[in-house]
């Protein structure tokens, strides 16, 4: 039977500054624990994780073993992240768990990872950390690394600063993701004779490609990211130790490491989650069911058809979107594997000094400053015409969406952090925000399509809520990554509940207007 290594395997370091600190003493033996527990069914035991008192995110801030000929140094990635970050949308499960195509591999699932995280948190509430072990050996290792010139300077980042950086990245990348989604929709749905007539498909595909690349990539945020380069004279002495490192465990360690970096959280949760939109996907399913999809974005009236054709249209939108999104996720992961050598050869990884000392501080101004700029552009739009207010399009097309986008992204971020770990086999946080965003989009759509109701400004605000808040509150990139990481039965249950629940909400919300008064013309969209 294939066994799955724990996501804590491969960590061999600590966060404390002292070589004799408890964290350093416990973390240095985790790789040996992996070899001892390798034959277990899920690679997890009381002595393997909870016995050491270590959390995957806490370990990721320690020393990271490199599957190469050079020794790992003490990583200075001392972001003080909350334990809830273990349940973020950015999963610990890589889309491609066997990149080398080995004949026998050990697979892990999302249920196992989140069960371990949940059990750790419960264990920490019941008992304190165990006493340190082998302090003499830990001190010797620390001194040997110090003499070898591989101990990096540590820079402690407080929890308040870490959360501030994370929120700022989320705000900034939610704005970029919203602009990318709206721009790609305009590019792919405006030309004649388009083979795909529903606008949500291409942003969802493109966002999943980026998500797959970020999840699989190990070069942008390298395993030794933020560490000083070791002394090359000591490389030969470290060959034997490097051979003992399990590449699968090291890969899982790197996945957990990335989730502690605010920039990575901003890219995966902020940009990819805002680039894709689950609520727009469900809206297009309902429009296909109600025979309004062909007329969406055009003045041509739909041709009447029977219910059987509407059911076929519903299946077409559903299957096409899910298939392309999953394909995009794996295509992005394959792209990351393919260009890994190129990144290594030309040293194209993100420089740690620039990110930690400059970009982390600059993003606070950029994030909140750009959000404020979107508010000001909504108050004074660039295309304002005093004599012809009906020609103002910027607010309905983009600026109001940018105002509401960070609110949806931050809501999704905290919902996933607090809810995703409650049911390991069913990501509750992602499900809740997808259902909530779908319902809100349905209400905004109804209010915008009620005949003879409201004016241009009210229409623009509702359009901004639909494109900005609902578009960033719901996500397809995270959803398909969870489908790929869950066990087969749980994936079908979770996927079916998400699509079925979202469509049921749209039938109730949008159907109540569609099958009574009918959809009217939108006043603020040309």
Swiss-Prot record:
Biased composition (Basic and acidic residues): 21-36, 103-123
A GO cellular component entry from the record: plasma membrane
Membrane topology (Cytoplasmic): 1-159, 216-260, 332-361, 420-424, 474-492
Region of interest (Disordered), ranges: 1-73, 90-149, 223-242
Protein name: Fluoride export protein 1
Knockout consequences: Highly sensible to fluoride. Growth is inhibited at a 200-fold lower fluoride concentration than in the wild-type.
Spans traversing the lipid bilayer: 160-180, 195-215, 261-281, 311-331, 362-382, 399-419, 425-445, 453-473, 493-513
Membrane topology: Multi-pass membrane protein
